[in-house]
Every structure is written in structure tokens, then in C-alpha cells.
Regions:
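Forkhead-associated
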Residues: 46-127
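Intrinsically disordered, low-complexity acidic Ser/Thr-rich regulatory segments
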Residues: 1-65, 77, 81-84
Length: 128
């Protein structure tokens, strides 16, 4: 009785021996913050993937008029992760810190419904 042979494939042409990298474009993502507690309660802020600044200073994208908030308190931004954009919050060495779900953070991945606290203000993160 003979052993069946496995079929053999012809060798790949030169330069095609490495696997092809498949590029995946990040899907559009919509994210925003809603001010739950603070001077602008109920206000909605759309987040830009390239970055959204938050602080007491007048040049911030999101202005929080609270003396416990630093002039340039934190920054929200997105980075591509596989096929979607992942949003982060980063504290900018603020005096009183940035908190996500009760924990002080330096840089933190954000998930839908996370609560961000800066000074006396509480904002909820939303993402589609």
C-alpha cells in the first residue's frame, strides 16, 4: 500500500515570499462629552480625533469656568486601533488632576459612558 503524497505548490516568484500587509482604514467614529455637573451643565461638546483641549483658559476647545481647573487641564484625542478610532484623555500636569470613573489618571483609554471629572465639573464620554 502506498502513502498518498501531499500536493506541492510551485515556489513563489522572487520578491513575493513575504506575506502581504493588509491595510485597514479606521472607520469614522463620533464621540462627544456631555457636561453633567458644572458651570455649563447640559452642554454637548463634539470631540475631534486630532485633539480637543479642555481647561479654564479662553483658548481651549472646552472651557470649564472653575477655579479648581487648570488653564490647560487635559486633552482628549483619538488614535486608530485596528479598524476604529480609540479615544483617550490625557492630563496636562494639572494642579488638581483628571479623574476617570473615580480614578486619577495621566492618560486613559475612554469607553462609552465613562465619567471624567476635572475640578467640580463632571462630563460623560459618549461614542458611536
Amino acid at each position: 500500500m502506498s502513502t498518498p503524497l501531499s500536493p506541492t505548490l510551485p515556489p513563489l516568484p522572487d520578491g513575493e515570499s513575504e506575506p502581504t500587509l493588509v491595510l485597514v482604514e479606521a472607520k469614522p467614529s463620533f464621540a462627544w462629552l456631555v457636561m453633567l455637573h458644572g458651570p455649563r451643565r447640559g452642554r454637548l461638546y463634539h470631540l475631534r480625533a486630532e485633539g480637543t483641549s479642555l481647561g479654564r483658559g479662553a483658548t481651549n476647545d472646552i472651557i470649564v469656568d472653575d477655579e479648581a481647573v487648570s488653564r490647560f487641564h487635559s486633552r482628549l484625542f483619538a488614535e486608530p486601533v485596528f479598524d476604529k478610532l480609540q479615544f483617550y484623555v490625557q492630563d496636562l500636569a494639572s494642579a488638581n488632576g483628571t479623574f476617570v470613573n473615580g480614578l486619577r489618571v495621566v492618560r486613559q483609554v475612554l469607553h462609552d459612558e465613562d465619567r471624567i471629572v476635572v475640578g467640580q465639573a463632571t462630563l460623560v464620554f459618549k461614542q458611536l
